[in-house]
């Protein structure tokens, strides 16, 4: 029978000093036999997705204590990728994921916590905490801050739904007036919460539902809606039950590695492909699987991508659809429900809240339940009032969206496309693979060939695009922006947004060993592995080389002979795999430490002490 980890610091004469310190935090004699639950919060005033979390940790703590546990809260860092975008701040985004995972490990192991509730939300925070939960393998429940309401603005007599990406694209479009840009800017991000489309943050919070580590509605219930409070309240009670099940009943189904098994990772990736999630999720899912010692690789993702259809398109793939619309259509449980009907899910995986995922779907899918409570829950609507306050409104849609032929969520028989929303491409340009969000690619450019325009930094590409030096038909190649080469694997949202603002969104391709924001759409291919800094072929591309992209056949090729590539490789080996241009980039000791152990994206950009 497992023993509560916390007994290490709460029992025995030799722990008198530790108990004295625990007492100084407010613990009493009656608390020393209870499970100590870490409330892992990520409140910060820097990030709209986290600005409302300050009091939510204590909300969970009170519920833990009411359920018979002891709650101890601490905070992690949280980087806002949108604010860090387009300058050296983005170098810190992906490395912050490892720092978050490490900090959770440090705090939980140093203080011998028995279990934890992870209050996450934005891009690297959910992945970092997910990695920590699988690394530590103690009972864990995830509850995120929730998505932002979509912006609404009336311009020239027409109402538009907006998000962050709209503001960025408008700012670079010379045809849009300063007044209209300002109007869009002021309306794009109206409330607290993670950005309103199917960007990285919301994608990851949705995937925790499929993994079985969070409650139904975690990925889609708006941050501002009163219904979201229930998730925090239930998480507090649930984690105490999970802790008791494991430590007092030896029930390993309460542990993250049992719940988030390989089959559960297949479910999560199936969902990701079906909903056209951010390509960053591939990076984070691979990293989380690595932490859980689960054999889940790019090959598994490739296999799934070939049989899972695209059942939902949300901004940026469909600019007028946001997370509030997904929720109205039944949220993640209803997407999983459609996948289940198509025989594409592992139903028997356990979850933190139900015996199996199949049981959860049967209860929470709006097309198969008669529960008015469930149906009311998914009618939660935006309040339409700018606010930074959680649970501040309780608006409801009059009706649910249950149209599975033409609605926000489609059935397997009526998909947006038979091919899923993500694809793995391989070829001599990316021997270990690269990723494209096919849900955001226009059908006219699923096959594309063009001459390479080579840039050795994101900044150089942006300068060329804005100067109209990139033309229709070009393939923009941005290299030395991978985990090691960047370092930090910057997001390329500005280059893709500027291509769109220049009218080239359907006329150019972009390939990089960096990554893309969840807000990216177009023929944007990232995670090219190996990256240039690790000797990848992307480092051998020269200006004007022809590149062939074939998404239906999952290939990406540099039209250069093997003999020529071998000669170029020998030349590059002699020079060293570094950018030829001097980049004005402040790479600090902290970033150098990350780069020293970073692997390429096909391994999730995790650290490997054997990397040289």
From Swiss-Prot:
UniProt keyword terms in alphabetical order: 2Fe-2S, Amino-acid biosynthesis, Branched-chain amino acid biosynthesis, Iron, Iron-sulfur, Lyase, Magnesium, Metal-binding
Catalyzed reaction equations: (2R)-2,3-dihydroxy-3-methylbutanoate = 3-methyl-2-oxobutanoate + H2O; (2R,3R)-2,3-dihydroxy-3-methylpentanoate = (S)-3-methyl-2-oxopentanoate + H2O
Biological-process GO terms, alphabetical: isoleucine biosynthetic process; L-valine biosynthetic process
Residue numbers of N6-carboxylysine PTMs: 124
Binding site for [2Fe-2S] cluster: 122, 195
GO molecular function, one term: dihydroxy-acid dehydratase activity
Phenotype seen when the gene is deleted: Does not nodulate the roots of pea plants.
Residue positions of the active site: 517
The UniProt record lists the keyword Amino-acid biosynthesis: yes
GO cellular component, one term: cytosol
Keyword Flavoprotein included in the entry's annotation: no
Cofactors required: [2Fe-2S] cluster; Mg(2+)
Binding positions (Mg(2+)): 81, 123-124, 491
Record text on cofactor binding: Binds 1 [2Fe-2S] cluster per subunit. This cluster acts as a Lewis acid cofactor.
InterPro entries reported for this sequence: Dihydro-acid_dehy_C, DihydroxyA_deHydtase, DiOHA_6PGluconate_deHydtase_CS, ILV_EDD_C, ILV_EDD_N, IlvD/EDD_N
Broad EC category: lyase
EC number per UniProt: 4.2.1.9
Record pathway: Amino-acid biosynthesis; L-isoleucine biosynthesis; L-isoleucine from 2-oxobutanoate: step 3/4; Amino-acid biosynthesis; L-valine biosynthesis; L-valine from pyruvate: step 3/4
Subunit record text: Homodimer.
Protein family (similarity comment): Belongs to the IlvD/Edd family.
Function: Functions in the biosynthesis of branched-chain amino acids. Catalyzes the dehydration of (2R,3R)-2,3-dihydroxy-3-methylpentanoate (2,3-dihydroxy-3-methylvalerate) into 2-oxo-3-methylpentanoate (2-oxo-3-methylvalerate) and of (2R)-2,3-dihydroxy-3-methylbutanoate (2,3-dihydroxyisovalerate) into 2-oxo-3-methylbutanoate (2-oxoisovalerate), the penultimate precursor to L-isoleucine and L-valine, respectively.
Name used for this protein in its record: Dihydroxy-acid dehydratase
Originating species: Rhizobium johnstonii (strain DSM 114642 / LMG 32736 / 3841) (Rhizobium leguminosarum bv. viciae)
